[in-house]
Amino acid sequence: QVDGTDFTRYDDDYEVMFFYPLSKHTYGDAVVRITAYEDGCTINVSYELPIDEAMMPDVLTFFNYLNNSRYVGKVMLLDIDGDWYPAYEVFMSINPEDIDAWDRGCVMDYTFNAFYVMQEMTDYLPELEKGETPKNVYAMWLSDVWDE
């Protein structure tokens, strides 16, 4: 562990995990996992705190709407020890054996995008908690996207 960051080696995979504070703490800080595989790298950003299991169907429906929209990666729910964590994940095809050849700017751009997506979700997931339908929350998201 270096400065709060865990570097873990699993068989042929390497994983870096760290926490990053979000400006809105509805679901805690962001948990970032970057896992290098033989043929690429997965960037995954989730929340530190799980959502209520009763919200799971609505969150999945909302995320399915989003996944059919503009995102390069995908928003999902991770099941970790029976708790459900909203997350955004993107896979990059890279060679972890040749770190000098990585486009570090691209890795940083995708990581920043993942932070942005999860930060933005803190505006929409509470609407589902308040009883708003996934379709209406998606319409809110679309309206905000078109206003940007």
Predicted ranges, named:
Residues 124-148:
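Short, highly charged C-terminal tails/helix-capping segments
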Residues 105-131:
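A conserved amphipathic terminal alpha-helix motif
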Residues 3-28, 37-48:
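Ser/Thr-rich, low-complexity intrinsically disordered terminal regions
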Residues 5, 55, 125-129:
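Solvent-exposed interaction surfaces and binding hotspots enriched for charged
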